[in-house]
């Protein structure tokens, strides 16, 4: 079971998952069940590259940094609690300079599941039985 949090998130569309496999709707449906998902100006087919994708192997470090900073400016504009992504490389790239907590979708769902657990109360603490010691 999951718990819907009052926290907010934006979703970064990873290049391969989105443009490569046309998966845009499903990650948002999942996130909407557990956080308040905010829209960003460039998402889905218009989503921004993280700056470190496999398609950017021809770019130098400065170019990759500029792409990352541009994407983070868009994603952090409305001060969400989380930037969510479904790509470990995008997460690793954004964590370098994000002011917002960057998490994989699975981490956000897991946190929601942890928050939905009912507390367990221990009515009685049983002491362990003393073991008999046999001397030889």
Language model features: what each stretch is:
Residues 1-136:
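Iron-sulfur cluster-binding electron-transfer modules in prokaryotic oxidoreductases
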